[in-house]
């Protein structure tokens, strides 16, 4: 879809909120951090940005 997802691994605490809220399963927890594994599926809805308590996700 043309959206770029960046997770600041220094800020990410691995809470999984982005994993739970994403409607197209862009994220996966790996080694205790959120990783965008299906970035090409991103709809740009920004739900992940809104729920991240650490502001670790940038679109």
Swiss-Prot record:
Tagged with keyword Lyase: no
Record InterPro entries: 3Fe4S_ferredoxin (IPR001080), 4Fe4S_Fe-S-bd (IPR017896), 4Fe4S_Fe_S_CS (IPR017900), Fe-S_Ferredoxin (IPR050572)
Domain of life: Bacteria
Main location: periplasm
The entry's keywords: 4Fe-4S, Electron transport, Iron, Iron-sulfur, Metal-binding, Periplasm, Repeat, Transport
Binding site for [4Fe-4S] cluster 2: 22, 42, 45, 48
GO cellular component: periplasmic space
Chain ranges of the 4Fe-4S ferredoxin-type domain: 3-32, 33-59
GO MF assignments: 4 iron, 4 sulfur cluster binding; electron transfer activity; iron ion binding
Cofactor entry: [4Fe-4S] cluster
Location within or outside the cell: Periplasm
SUPFAM superfamilies, per database record: 4Fe-4S ferredoxins
Cofactor: how bound: Binds 2 [4Fe-4S] clusters.
Ligand binding ([4Fe-4S] cluster 1): 12, 15, 18, 52
Function summary: Ferredoxins are iron-sulfur proteins that transfer electrons in a wide variety of metabolic reactions.
Subunit relationships: Homodimer.
Protein name per UniProt: Ferredoxin-2
Biological source species: Desulfomicrobium norvegicum (strain DSM 1741 / NCIMB 8310)
